[in-house]
Amino acid sequence: MHATGLAAPAGTPRLRKWPSKRRVPVSQPGMADPHQFFDDTSSAPSRGYGGQPSPGSLGYPTSSSEAAFLAAPMSNMAMAYGSSLAAQGKELVDKNIDRFIPVSKLKYYFAVDTVYVGKKLGLLVFPYLHQDWEVQYQQDTPVAPRFDINAPDLYIPAMAFITYILVAGLALGTQDRMIGGVLTGLLFGKIGYYLVLAWCCVSIFVFMIRTLRLKILAQAAAEGVPVRGARNQLRMYLTMAVAAAQPVLMYWLTFHLVR
């Protein structure tokens, strides 16, 4: 007896159940989980439709490059403006000072160097062997003192005055009082003082006569005045009077230091 009902008829093939091939969605870095309520912002910023691309990725300059680009012209402009203000201020100061003190002319008398100062001091102390006393000119303008030992200068007189004050103050300070002191007398007494004073007086007299005499003669020749004219003779007498007054001034400034 054949079973009926669930039995399959003869000749009919049986169906086999294969496992389900449904693909499980894999979460990608750029896609959000459908079961997640909020986006995960802890990872790198997304570049999808909602993300904004960075300016540098599109070829536009970033904020740092823009600052560097703008800083260079601004600094150059500020530097140029400051330099122009400094130049204008210097020019204004020079104009105001030149009204009272000819600074441009005074610069000539201070254009000296160490070699010139050494040679000029030697000439002041030993003027007897010097032969050429003429001042050198270049295009009708006297050369700077550092190029000509005969050129006049104000550096040595200024430094001599400052040195006198310093040495006199030192000598007075050794006496523990500000009246009465000694300079040369500290070492050699009055005899040494008078010997040095006599030598300096004669040297400065010879130096001034030889230097100023040529200056007066050159000026007289330029003006067309006769050398033995009354005006030129008056200049020579005044020069000799100024030279003769130097020893008197030297003694008056130093005699109280050897009392």
UniProtKB/Swiss-Prot annotation:
Tell me which UniProt keywords the record has, alphabetically.
Acetylation, Endoplasmic reticulum, Golgi apparatus, Membrane, Phosphoprotein, Protein transport, Transmembrane, Transmembrane helix, Transport
Record carries keyword NAD: no
Q: Where are the transmembrane segments?
A: 154-174, 187-207, 238-258
Query: What GO cellular component entries does it have?
Result: COPII-coated ER to Golgi transport vesicle; endoplasmic reticulum; endoplasmic reticulum membrane; endoplasmic reticulum-Golgi intermediate compartment; endoplasmic reticulum-Golgi intermediate compartment membrane; Golgi apparatus; Golgi membrane
Q: What is its main location?
A: endoplasmic reticulum
Which residue ranges does the entry give as Extracellular-facing topology?
A: 175-186, 259
Cytoplasmic side of membrane: 9-153, 208-237
One of the Pfam families matching this protein, by short name: YIF1
List N-acetylmethionine occurrences by residue.
Answer: 1
- Where Phosphoserine occurs along the chain? 64
Membrane topology for this entry?
Multi-pass membrane protein
Q: Does the keyword Cell division apply?
A: no
Which domain of life, per UniProt? Eukaryota
Q: Where do the segments described as Disordered lie?
A: 1-61
Q: Which GO terms describe its biological process?
A: cilium assembly; endoplasmic reticulum to Golgi vesicle-mediated transport; protein targeting to membrane; protein transport; sperm flagellum assembly
Subcellular location, in the record's words? Endoplasmic reticulum membrane; Golgi apparatus membrane; Endoplasmic reticulum-Golgi intermediate compartment membrane
According to its UniProt entry, the function of this protein is described as: Functions in endoplasmic reticulum to Golgi vesicle-mediated transport and regulates the proper organization of the endoplasmic reticulum and the Golgi. Plays a key role in targeting to neuronal dendrites receptors such as HTR1A. Plays also a role in primary cilium and sperm flagellum assembly probably through protein transport to these compartments.
Q: Give the multimer and partner information.
A: Interacts with HTR1A (via C-terminus). Interacts with ABCB9 (via TMD0); this interaction allows (but is not essential) the ER-to-Golgi trafficking and strongly depends on a salt bridge within TMD0.
Q: What is this protein called?
A: Protein YIF1B
**What species is this protein from?**
Rattus norvegicus
